[in-house]
Amino acid sequence: MRGFEAKEYQDRVLKLQKKMQDKNIDITLITSPHNFRYFTGLDSYFWESPTRPWFLLIPQSNDPIAIIPSIGETALQKTWIKNIQTWPSPQPEDEGVSALMESLKNIIPHTGNIGCELGQESHLRMSINDFDTLRKNLSNCNFIDASEIIWQLRIIKSQEEIKKIKKIISIASDVFDNLPNYIKIGMTEIEICNIFKKELLNKGADHTLYMSCASGVGGYNQIICDPTEKKLQDGDLLIIDTGTTLDGYFCDFDRNYGFGNIKKEVNDAYLILWEATEKAFEKTKPGLTCADISNAMGSILNKPNLASNSVGRMGHGLGLQLTEPPSIMNSDKTILKENMIITIEPCYEYLPGKMIVIEENILITKDGYELLTSRTPKLLPIIN
């Protein structure tokens, strides 16, 4: 089924309310698309229009209150949310702020704490001017960060979430595994990526919201840009990294392909990187930390005569967003817990301007991990 049963969302709200009680937060204000979807189940890309803000109020007790543009009322009525208030929008002079203030005053008539998405990897989806107006008119209240307790919920996936993530990863794995049957020397990056995207849709994916591609002789110098009209030639190494969704949930991993005659130094660098991911798996289990995983990869990559090996981190969380907390890096001491889903993503720049990246998606299980992606081949796939 699309989405989840109402109980899934109700349980999320109850868990948040318990954390709000512990942190003395009277009400949490949700404005960002992914958090709004997480607690309501609304499935819409209408968020791509920045004109209208949407608000969800989650009190410390009782059901959530949605305050939304009138255009969204019918759509939100299809979710489990019952208390829906609207205003006619666009209305730049008062884009829902008066309605939001009135609801907040009804819930907190005197003084209290309002939790907002103010912390790391979070943002407000309302204008700063409107947020300032809100704070000035509710000077009896403290506006504090609630992003930490929201992420504490979101980084642990439910069984129903895990099913969806496993499905989209399986779809993308199959397409990656079969891609060599469709591509050849002389095709452009765009042509190859278009084939890839079409196959993803044919296999049942919903959207490919992120697809980076790069290529070059023996390696590439970046991993975040769109494909270009560059033709793949003998000696080139191609990477495709996809963030494709099913019912809102992402996969995020890459695969590399060599074209024609690949030098020994490239194959050697690829194998070193593959071995680094093997080391990472050994440290992927509950009770260990993100830093433990990062250090394990560093034991392979941080050796004399090896070049740089990181683009800032070597993996991250995964779910309703392409990247989520935590980060796989030496400074992140987040403890791994059962039902987290993370990516393992070491980068190895074996020569200046020539990097290779391998990425896998991992579920943390009770006793260890489950590899969700089909394993990156130990030997670089060659396209002739």
Where are these regions (language model features)?
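Active-site neighborhoods and metal-handling regions in enzymes and metal-associated proteins
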Residues: M1-N384
